[in-house]
Amino acid sequence: MPTIQQLIRTERQHLTRKTKSPALRACPERRGVCTRVYTSTPKKPNSALRKVARVRLTSGFEVTAYIPGIGHNLQEHSVVLIRGGRVKDLPGVRYHIIRGTLDTAGVKDRSQSRSKYGAKASKQD
């Protein structure tokens, strides 16, 4: 516990918060180019082939981003938009690719939670 005199001499230092998505550089989204599109296996209790992409961002970082939804059209040199948000069972994946923007197509035949997957409204007869 500091004395009053010590507080006058040097004030208390504020805690600096560490960001969970440093590659975004305080922006909500960043554009990037896919350098590799592949599948990855999740951590211990889960089993799947999760679709991920290695992306070189305009901020100069190269990050691993998750491709949400069923099926995708991404390949090497595709231009994508990424947002923050980790995938709990994939170590090192701290970003999501935004579906339905730039070169990323929306999910086909999606009727619920469409806005999260860039799917257009289906034609109702």
Swiss-Prot record:
InterPro entries: NA-bd_OB-fold, Ribosomal_uS12, Ribosomal_uS12_bac. One of its GO terms (biological process) is translation. GO terms for cellular component: small ribosomal subunit. Disulfide bonds: none annotated. PROSITE patterns: RIBOSOMAL_S12. Residues 104-125 are annotated as: Disordered. The keyword Chaperone does not apply. Pfam families: Ribosom_S12_S23. Keywords: Methylation, Ribonucleoprotein, Ribosomal protein, RNA-binding, rRNA-binding, tRNA-binding. It comes from the Bacteria. The modification 3-methylthioaspartic acid is found at residue 89. GO terms for molecular function: rRNA binding; structural constituent of ribosome; tRNA binding. Part of the 30S ribosomal subunit. Contacts proteins S8 and S17. May interact with IF1 in the 30S initiation complex. With S4 and S5 plays an important role in translational accuracy. Interacts with and stabilizes bases of the 16S rRNA that are involved in tRNA selection in the A site and with the mRNA backbone. Located at the interface of the 30S and 50S subunits, it traverses the body of the 30S subunit contacting proteins on the other side and probably holding the rRNA structure together. The combined cluster of proteins S8, S12 and S17 appears to hold together the shoulder and platform of the 30S subunit. Belongs to the universal ribosomal protein uS12 family. This is Small ribosomal subunit protein uS12. The lineage of its organism: Bacteria, Bacillati, Cyanobacteriota, Cyanophyceae, Synechococcales.
